[in-house]
Amino acid sequence: MSAKKPMALVILDGYGYREDNQDNAIANAKTPVLDGLIANQPNTLISASGLDVGLPDGQMGNSEVGHTNIGAGRVVYQDLTRITKSIADGEFGQTEALVNAVDKAVKVDKAVHIMGLMSPGGVHSHEDHIYAAVEMAAARGAEKIYLHAFLDGRDTPPRSAENTLARFQELFAKLGKGRVASLIGRYYAMDRDNNWDRVQESYDLLTQAKAEFTFDTAVAGLEAAYARDENDEFVKATEIKAEGEESAVIVDGDAVIFMNYRADRAREITRAFVPDFDGFARNVFPAIDFVMLTQYAADIPLLCAFPPASLENTYGEWLSKEGKTQLRISETEKYAHVTFFFNGGKEDEFEGEERQLVASPKVATYDLQPEMSAPELTEKLVAAIKGGKYDAIVCNFPNCDMVGHTGVYDAAVKAVESLDECLGKVVEAIKEADGQLLITADHGNAEMMVNPETGGIHTAHTNLPVPLIYVGNKDVEFKEGGKLSDLAPTMLSLSGIDIPVEMSGDVIVK
């Protein structure tokens, strides 16, 4: 059997294009390989944000959204827009799972706990949704409404939570009931890399009020964290209660609503509330009604307010139906993105699909190791390309995003330079295998390391375009105006495979 000539897609997570070189880790890095590709290979810029990926106009893209759109080959209406629309239409307050959980707690005079990432960032959650959930609980008669605030500082400026917390303090004052009950940074509450010691700190705060600090108000707790030099993301467990108030812990009979809609960083803390769990020893395990805003994983047996819409004939599924073989490969931080999200929210492999996982380094923050596990990932990717086993390969390099999120400029430059070295080996392997390669990104990040308006560190994604570069055995010219959802139909076309009718994206090669 002759060796296959693979179609490889390499996604440089967080690698956006920005004309201004100021504080631009991508433009200022030494990248001879990428420079040569841009000079000599077909390339263009494509959109990875806003309406083009099913988000509100102007909203920055993110990894979940990006990979879902790439894999689907069509613009996918995202959870953010779907839930926002349900609030505007008045349907949110009638959502069965939410209504049932709140009503059950109210009936027996129990508390409604609402937790989630308190941020206007729109990547994992949106504070407007949390606001609507508080209003809904109050409207249905809940007297004890406790808000557990996970703080952002990653998809938002590092110290930007005060306005959000003040907004909710005003809401509770207006309602005359409820309060912010706890604060903790997303570093602890939203881990996704099996750092169970961090997750346990969040769980113990929620269920036992186990906290290093206690303050009368959320804003006071936040100000104290800043005084300790903790940015929003890293705020340590803080209980919020005034003198004479009881701790607002989760106990038997309560309702818990988790208002994050993005799955990957919601799973670990959610699993801690499921009976079958071995991440850490739980001192208490309350019998509660727990509602996930969206489905975080198919094997989590909890209520879900907005079940996933089914996506048929994604790139991976279509390749499988066509009898093709495919490989998905990344390191831990983005493994879910090239598998679960790329497959339209489906956990299981398709027939003919294989997966390889490279462990992300165990460091506190990735500025400490900006190359992450890229060398090992590259070694495996090159072997897969040369091995002749796969018709299609999808690989994600997380570096520009994960290091970009730290806000450490010099580390981000090193991340880009390490990727460039790796790409040289990948390009060489593709040419040797007489295959085809598309290099792109799911969203921007490392091209803006300082906020040009405030002068502060910029740790969030951007809404800037991303590159698309072709390397291969075909004479290719790109059309202008492409977007992420055009990649799957374009790859199928370049591979000589029919495009399923469900893929409404355009073929952007002439």
UniProtKB/Swiss-Prot annotation:
Binding positions for Mn(2+) 1 per the UniProt entry: 401, 405, 461
* Annotated Gene3D superfamilies: Alkaline Phosphatase, subunit A (3.40.720.10), BPG-independent phosphoglycerate mutase, domain B (3.40.1450.10)
Q: How is the cofactor bound?
A: Binds 2 manganese ions per subunit.
Instruction: Output one GO MF annotation.
Output: manganese ion binding
**What is any Pfam family matched here?**
iPGM_N
EC numbers listed for it are 5.4.2.12
Sites where the protein binds Mn(2+) 2: 13, 63, 442-443
Active site positions: 63
What is the similarity comment for this entry?
A: Belongs to the BPG-independent phosphoglycerate mutase family.
Query: What is the designated name of this protein?
Result: 2,3-bisphosphoglycerate-independent phosphoglycerate mutase
